[in-house]
């Protein structure tokens, strides 16, 4: 009788564990970045940069990034994007816009255009494929602009907030960074759009759950 009771308890404990595990897996989200150069899948790091992940997801859920471009591409360094200014035809204002997806105590709570994300510097190295937050000289000025490392760039470690990593589509990074820019066409050019692709590399970003994740179909 006692053995039966123990078995029943263990059985239900196992069921609870399975259900909890499935729910946890189902709730984990990834970012799907789609461009004409290909697709990338990004895994988030909410354990080390919870505010950055929360802000980025909030912006994705409002289609904020759709139609923005990778406006800064530097071989051996990074590709940068996420600025809503890049949706217009003025190349010279790219890299000057964007805001956080949620109010984190910085800026005017009633004006989302002023929202930024406080720094969450961590020990994750800026290696190839890492997703990190762009900012001004103010550490707490992260908004919507982000960059993906093309190569290992240790000089950025502990100076910018790493909050994700490309786990599929690294070759797409290479295609984007090799786009023709005013700087590659004319090395002496020093305009503000020097590293901005001549032919726009637009993106759409959406959230997908782990149950929807199919890495093979993205190759």
Predicted regions located by residue number:
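Bacterial N-terminal signal peptides
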Residues: 9-19
């Amino acid at each position: 009788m006692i053995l039966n009771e123990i078995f029943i308890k263990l059985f239900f404990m196992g069921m609870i564990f399975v259900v909890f595990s499935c729910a946890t897996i189902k709730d984990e989200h990834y970012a799907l970045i789609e461009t004409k150069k290909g697709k990338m899948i990004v895994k988030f790091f909410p354990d080390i940069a919870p505010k950055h992940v929360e802000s980025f997801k909030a912006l994705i859920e409002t289609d904020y990034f759709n139609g923005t471009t990778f406006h800064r591409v530097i071989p051996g360094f990074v590709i940068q994007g996420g600025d809503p200014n890049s949706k217009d035809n003025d190349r010279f204002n790219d890299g000057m816009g964007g805001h956080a997806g949620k109010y984190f105590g910085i800026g005017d709570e009633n004006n989302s255009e002023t929202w930024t994300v406080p720094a969450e510097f961590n020990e994750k190295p800026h290696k190839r494929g890492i997703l990190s937050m762009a900012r001004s000289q103010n550490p707490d000025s992260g908004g919507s602009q982000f960059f993906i490392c093309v190569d290992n760039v240790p000089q950025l470690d502990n100076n910018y907030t790493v909050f994700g990593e490309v786990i599929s589509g690294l070759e797409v990074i290479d295609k984007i960074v090799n786009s023709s820019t005013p700087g590659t066409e004319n090395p002496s050019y020093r305009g503000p759009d020097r590293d901005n692709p001549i032919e726009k590399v637009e993106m759409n970003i959406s959230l997908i759950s782990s149950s929807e994740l199919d890495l093979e179909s993205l190759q």
